[in-house]
Curated annotation (Swiss-Prot):
Protein's gene: CA2
Protein name: Carbonic anhydrase 2
Residues annotated as binding substrate: T198, T199
Chain sites annotated for binding Zn(2+): H94, H96, H119
Signal peptide annotation: none
Primary localization class, coarse: cytoplasm
Site entry (Fine-tunes the proton-transfer properties of H-64), positions: Y7, N62, N67
Length: 260
């Protein structure tokens, strides 16, 4: 059954609960990170981002965002330690962004919104594949990185330059030899909490790891994101903007910080 969810007035986040009742669940994402309430947990290990041998495959406009997909048939591109037990393989990354530079991120920090947010999606190898992993509360680890307006990040440029060839829903092109390490900030200090996918089916299977330090993106780079379309090629044009879910109630969850 194909649910036509999106980000518009009639199919946007406030409607998702009708088809996906877990939208009102106990561990939904994103959230606002209140830095005063987030407790430093000295037992949290430093995050190990082992992206030495990434094999990127293609980039695709899925009508909600665009995904850069990776070969996840081996442990060459993994996330481990930090709050995680075991090894999590990178399967894809995507972004959420706004119609203007003042909004676009899904998570917020003390209610502050960033221009965009990068999600690097990893699945727990103990479950064998992504489809099985999402059925478990510790199935996924998503590394969230804020983008703030500033100088252009060189590591983003190869992505940005490809967007014009995947303007509409369903379009994809080969996208090889991309190094996701170019998307990481210098510091890997993070906040972590148990949460969910931020798009339907909104499954509560994610250990969120949100980095404190943003990367920068230029206004020119952001404009290229906004040139994408939600629609398929022959359909009326709908600019792909504001593809973010608003923050959800914390419902008693504790956000932990890896830093003082």
């Amino acid at each position: 059954m194909s649910h036509h969810w999106g980000y518009g007035k009639h199919n946007g986040p406030e409607h998702w609960h009708k088809d996906f009742p877990i939208a009102n669940g106990e561990r939904q994402s994103p959230i606002d990170i209140d830095t005063n309430a987030a407790k430093h947990d000295p037992s949290l290990k430093p995050l190990r981002v082992c992206y030495e041998h990434p094999i990127s495959r293609r980039i695709i406009n899925n009508g909600h965002s665009f995904n850069v997909e990776f070969d996840d048939s081996h442990d060459k591109t993994v996330l481990k330690e930090g709050p995680l037990e075991g090894t999590y393989r990178l399967i894809q990354f995507h972004f959420h962004w706004g119609s203007s530079d003042g909004q676009g991120s899904e998570h917020t920090v003390n209610k502050k919104k960033y221009a965009a947010e990068l999600h690097l999606v990893h699945w727990n190898t103990k479950y064998g594949d992504f489809g099985k992993a999402v059925k478990h509360p510790d199935g996924l680890a998503v590394l969230g990185i804020f983008l703030k307006i500033g100088s252009a990040t060189p590591g983003l440029q190869k992505v940005v330059d490809t967007l014009s060839s995947i303007k509409t829903k369903g379009k994809s092109v080969d996208f090889t030899d991309f190094d996701p390490r170019g998307l990481l900030p210098e510091s890997l200090d993070y906040w972590t909490y148990p949460g969910s996918l931020t798009t339907p089916p909104l499954l509560e299977c994610v250990t969120w790891i949100v980095l404190k330090e943003p990367i920068t993106v230029s206004s020119e780079q952001m404009l290229k994101f906004r040139n994408l379309n939600f629609n398929k090629e022959a359909e009326p044009e709908e600019p792909m903007v504001d593809n973010w879910r608003p923050t959800q109630p914390l419902k008693g969850r504790q956000v932990k910080a890896s830093f003082v």
